[in-house]
Amino acid sequence: MVADSDRGWAWTEAILGVNADVVHVCMSPNAIHIVKMLIKMCGDTYTDIRHKRNSRLIVEDHDFIFPDDIRDGDALVAFSRRKVLMLATLLKKEGYKVSVIYGSLPYSVRKAEVARFLNGESRIVVCTDAIGMGVNLPIRRIIFTESKKFDGKSKRFLNMSEVKQIAGRAGRKGMYDQGYVNSIEDRDQIGELLHGRYEQITSCVIQPPRKVLDMPYSLSEIFKIWLKTIEKKCFSVADLKNRIKLAEYIEKKHGEKINKDLEYSLINIPFDENSEKLKYLWQDLVDMTADGEPVSRMWYYVDTESEDIEAMKLDDLEQLYKKMDLLNSYCNALNISEYDERIRILKEKISELIVRELTNGEFFNKCKRCGKRLEWNHRFGMCEKCYEINKLERMRYKADKWR
């Protein structure tokens, strides 16, 4: 994780700055070199303890057919929330009890879904790669339902670290003597990655520390300077693109009404910056901070009745939970405690309803143009007929444009 361009800085800061007599750092073999470098930079000592996997991990020698080859203890891995929900729906239609796990689920919901699998209430897990971190389940077999994922920039083949991390969930010690791995596509390539040798991580990610605020420039300018001047020997710079945009919003609209220290806190509030609704909410919170009314105007955002939430579908419930997360982080950043209990109650209610939707809801792949139901693994967002119509319309548009 120290090499992750978005979140790696948090692990780097923890290793360099945690105040404790003994620190346990767990990692894959390819991170050992860079972590030892960080420890030596601090003048500290370390003990290198290596663990071996106790259960064998076997790539099956036959192709996996969905849903015919499903067995109890299987975990099906997909790389989008939409595909996870569709697979879960299809399995429930076949009579299977299913737990659903993906990254944007509230922690309490993930915990409830894990508990259902642990106590035998469900026998199959359908999940994203969120299962690869912090989840310990009695999974007998991992099935990759696809071999490529969208990483925020492009759709690419899984890398070695991802395959090893996900596949390693199969074969829990004490329950299974060995774990199994299979795939709906590219089984041989996944097997090669699973048993391949890691490349060493040569740099870790850092972001500007708070002390850079003393520089006589605006925060957005400081971040741009940081990107150009930071020594690159064993460090790489965190992706600051979005935070620079947030800082520029504050500086252009509010100028000196928000000091740099507060601005730094505001731009580091975590939220999904791809969501326009959450971005607008963040801007509203910044605006009311600049107006000096963060406490009195917060009630507007948490004044949601349980009856209104009851009628919501899964998409809206997840969006509302993200909104509550953003409000909670904002209150923490500004030390506002008046709404802690209200936000906690709302998050609990939303989580309960999300569990209900995951258990009882049905989710299918549909053509975004005509609404026709598509196969779960259909490559495009439209049926073949609508795809051809859409392609023809685009050709006509281009022809008209050049007349």
Model-found features: residue ranges?
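Post-DEXD/H (motif II) to motif III coupling segment of the RecA-like Helicase ATP-binding lobe
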Residues: 2-51
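Conserved two-lobed SF2 helicase motor
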Residues: 119-136
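Conserved helicase motor
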Residues: 81, 100-112, 128-132
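Conserved strand-helix element at the start of the C-terminal RecA-like helicase core
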Residues: 24-26, 32, 68-94, 98-102
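Structural recognition of the conserved hydrophobic beta-strand(s) that form the central parallel beta-sheet
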Residues: 22-28, 125-127, 143-144
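Conserved segment of the helicase C-terminal RecA-like domain
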Residues: 30-31, 137, 141-144, 148-151, ...
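Non-catalytic terminal extensions of ATP-dependent helicases
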Residues: 211-403
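C-terminal or mid-to-C-terminal helical accessory/interaction module adjacent to the motor/catalytic core
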Residues: 179, 191-230
